[in-house]
UniProtKB/Swiss-Prot annotation:
Catalysed reactions listed for this entry: a D-alpha-amino acid + A + H2O = a 2-oxocarboxylate + AH2 + NH4(+)
UniProt-listed HAMAP family: DadA
Described function: Oxidative deamination of D-amino acids.
Protein's recorded name: D-amino acid dehydrogenase
Highest taxon above the source species: Bacteria
GO cellular component: cytoplasm; plasma membrane
Gene field: dadA
MF GO annotations: D-amino-acid dehydrogenase activity
GO biological process: D-alanine catabolic process
Signal sequence residues: none
Length: 432
């Protein structure tokens, strides 16, 4: 089968790899000159299934109001003048109760755990290297309340069979020795030993090269103007004067998927702006060993080989990619506060990207009402974490194989009135 994939970020390239391995003739189209040039370029580097959770959570609406008046707030909102933004925020607000949070987090963890397993299998099979580490994730708490609230997430982890350690402040240095210098600022942490890290752009670039060697065609520097349709099928992809045809089409354009699908499929995917710093390591014993997540500021600090990646924050401001100095100052403040000797912060590279976010935090993976149009987008801050699992899942669905995990509640149909999953959702399916 000829499959055309729109997008060469980590999700699009992973989809191309698994579809090619399933025997399909795959073409990837992207306006950029190479893979992973946008959202996948400089993310936080975490592969953290256990911390897969929606931004829509109990208490967030009240916190959002408080954050409006804080200098280092993790969330900021700026109206972009569109009704779509207002509708999206309203849908997100409706997901901020406990029932929706647990449901959304459950399916996110399911897909993320499965994806981590797929990544491990890919690594074992191909030997792909991407400055990856398997040292786990450590979520840091600065207040007693944060430490106490960890029990809510632990319940989901236990249901999913995800190993964890709840650590008091005095034990944090056992996991991250450099934290011994700042343990007095912390109340404890939640460690997930099975989580991983790695350079997403490096992984995507190398996987794309492997996919090309396996027969995948990459059409870079090729802008997509429109999807053409005839009846209930997509007839081709219009790129200037050229029409590229396939038997199946996969939309993996991230935040740009919504506009490209306008008039065909309504998907609630909105750009969530984030920032990162990439910092050369100064002192090995002052740098992180793996990755930490600061619960207060929602900022991740991740160790690559000789670099530290600091990433986080969320701005609901549309497609504005302006680099704001106050955001850089927040990232610098957090990394200096926790790892004061770790990196040459003054030499950092500052970056911003747009994460494709759904109101419920769960990506949109599956077929649309068009019989040959498939979606693999809306992964938000978890594109790197979920890429391999989403790629394998979309490959299985297009190939007519039964996926290893429940999947019907990942499709865009869940936003339709009266939608009910067709089968029970067992998180343990992520380990099948």
């Amino acid at each position: 089968m000829r499959v055309v994939i729109l997008g060469s970020g980590v999700v699009g390239v992973a989809s191309a790899w698994y579809l090619s391995q399933a025997g399909h003739d795959v073409t990837v189209i992207d306006r950029q000159p190479g893979p992973a040039e946008e959202t996948s370029a400089a993310n936080a580097g975490q592969i953290s299934p256990g911390y897969a959770a929606p931004w829509a959570a109990p208490g967030v609406p009240l916190k959002a109001i408080k954050w409006m008046f804080q200098r280092h707030a993790p969330l900021a909102i700026g109206l972009d003048g569109t009704s779509f933004q207002l509708k999206w925020m309203w849908q997100m607000l409706r997901n901020c109760d406990t029932r929706h949070y647990m449901e959304n987090k459950g399916r996110m963890v399911r897909l993320a755990e499965y994806s981590r397993d797929c990544l491990k299998a890919l690594r074992d099979t191909t030997g792909i290297q991407y400055e990856g580490r398997q040292g786990g994730t450590l979520q840091l708490f600065r207040t007693a309340k944060q430490y106490e609230n960890a029990t809510r997430d632990i319940a989901v982890l236990e249901d999913a069979g995800v190993p964890y350690q709840l650590l008091e402040a005095k034990r944090l240095a056992e996991v991250e020795p450099a934290l011994a210098e700042v343990s007095h600022k912390l109340t404890g942490g939640l460690r997930l030993p099975n989580d991983e890290t790695g350079d997403c752009q490096l992984f995507t670039t190398r996987l794309a090269a492997m996919a090309e060697q396996a027969g995948v065609t990459f059409r870079f520097n090729t802008a997509v103007d429109a999807l053409l349709h005839e009846g209930d099928r997509i007839a081709g992809v219009k790129c200037g004067d050229e029409i590229i045809k396939g038997d199946a089409y996969v939309m993996a354009f991230g935040s740009y998927s919504t506009a490209m699908l306008k008039g065909l499929v309504d998907i609630p995917v909105y750009p969530l702006k984030g920032y990162s710093l990439t910092i050369p390591i100064a002192q090995e014993d002052g740098a992180p060993v793996s990755t930490i997540l600061d619960e207060t500021y929602k900022i991740a600090i991740t160790r690559f080989d000789q670099r530290i990646r600091v990433g986080g924050m969320a701005e609901i401001v549309g497609f504005n990619k302006t680099l704001l100095q106050p955001r850089r100052e927040t990232l610098e403040m957090v990394v200096r506060d926790l790892f004061p000797r770790g990196g040459h912060v003054e030499q950092a590279t500052f970056w911003t990207g747009l994460r494709p976010m759904t109101p419920d935090g769960t990506p949109v993976v599956g077929r649309t009402a068009y019989k040959n149009l498939w979606l693999n987008t809306g992964h938000g801050t978890l594109g790197w974490t979920m890429a391999c699992g989403s790629g394998q899942l979309i490959s299985d669905l297009i190939s007519g194989r039964t996926p290893a995990i429940p999947y019907d509640d990942l499709a865009v149909a869940r936003y339709s009135p009266g939608f009910t999953p067709a089968r029970p959702q067992h998180l343990h399916g992520a380990h099948n």
